[in-house]
């Protein structure tokens, strides 16, 4: 059984929601990313979403774009991130999902990317800009290596939700708003109607993300989904430039505050 399925099954039995935490791999550096992942797990994260830095991340807001640029400026390569996951796997069995742009996968080679991801211990991929027409090719290779291609749907893609969720695995990443990522004070999309629509097409667990800024918002949204994705609000804390110990402490405290409400 894939680690993602196992985690959602366990959470369901416990009556809890999944806390999915996003960070950019290599920001501020690979060794610190390793420490952050272990700190996130310790604080109660259920799934780690590792962003592979990309020079033109269309779905990302300024916080994650800046994070990507910092990692790229350090010369981070996909191979470094594969090695990082291998290191994490020596210590942890937490589900790990890459958030990666299609061009990065294509340039690396679809088959090689999925084979290396499997060997490293990756459980799933989210490819936010994957064209629907390329989906089958990636899906076939992902299935071969038993890696889940996690569908990402948005409120604007109603007519495409069926096509995007078809054959998806793991969970559906439901974007709460149109536009780019980033912590917000409030979310104005009619989420109840949106989540009903997604549920009409798939019985997979659904996680809400994009714009979730803290525990108050997570508390309000948890009844609508099976999990919450928090990214920019964590990346902001990593970027503050504290010394390593202070930063890890603040990230852990923030994630603990999210875990408590879920």
Swiss-Prot record:
Entry annotation: catalytic residues: 49, 60
Pathway assigned in UniProt: Amino-acid biosynthesis; L-tryptophan biosynthesis; L-tryptophan from chorismate: step 5/5
GO molecular function term, any single one: tryptophan synthase activity
Enzyme Commission number(s) of this protein: 4.2.1.20
Keywords, sorted A to Z: Amino-acid biosynthesis, Aromatic amino acid biosynthesis, Lyase, Tryptophan biosynthesis
Chemical reaction(s) catalysed: (1S,2R)-1-C-(indol-3-yl)glycerol 3-phosphate + L-serine = D-glyceraldehyde 3-phosphate + L-tryptophan + H2O
Family annotation (Gene3D superfamilies): Aldolase class I
This protein's GO CC annotations: cytosol
Pfam families assigned: Trp_syntA
Function: The alpha subunit is responsible for the aldol cleavage of indoleglycerol phosphate to indole and glyceraldehyde 3-phosphate.
Protein family according to the UniProt entry: Belongs to the TrpA family.
Subunit comment: Tetramer of two alpha and two beta chains.
Entry protein name: Tryptophan synthase alpha chain
UniProt gene name: trpA
């Amino acid at each position: 059984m894939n680690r993602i399925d196992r985690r959602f099954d366990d959470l369901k039995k416990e009556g809890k929601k999944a806390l999915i935490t996003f960070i950019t791999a290599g920001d501020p550096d690979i060794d610190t990313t390793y420490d952050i992942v272990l700190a996130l797990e310790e604080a109660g994260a259920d799934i780690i979403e590792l962003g592979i830095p990309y020079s033109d991340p269309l779905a990302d807001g300024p916080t994650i774009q800046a994070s990507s640029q910092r990692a790229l400026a350090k010369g981070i390569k996909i191979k470094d991130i594969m090695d990082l996951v291998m290191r994490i796997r020596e210590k942890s069995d937490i589900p790990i999902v890459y958030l990666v742009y299609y061009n990065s996968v294509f340039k690396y080679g679809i088959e090689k990317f999925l084979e290396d991801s499997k060997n490293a211990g990756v459980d799933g991929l989210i490819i936010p800009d994957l064209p629907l027409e390329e989906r089958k090719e990636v899906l076939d290779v992902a299935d071969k290596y038993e890696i889940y291609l996690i569908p990402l749907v948005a409120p604007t893609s109603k007519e495409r939700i069926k096509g995007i969720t078809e054959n998806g695995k793991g969970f559906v990443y439901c974007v709460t708003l149109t536009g780019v990522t980033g912590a917000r004070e409030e979310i104005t999309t009619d989420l109840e109607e949106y989540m009903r629509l997604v549920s009409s097409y798939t019985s997979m667990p659904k996680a809400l993300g994009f714009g979730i800024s803290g525990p108050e918002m997570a508390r309000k949204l948890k009844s609508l989904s099976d999990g919450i994705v928090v990214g920019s609000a964590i990346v902001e804390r990593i970027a503050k430039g504290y010394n390593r110990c202070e930063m890890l402490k603040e990230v852990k405290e923030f994630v603990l505050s999210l875990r408590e409400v879920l």
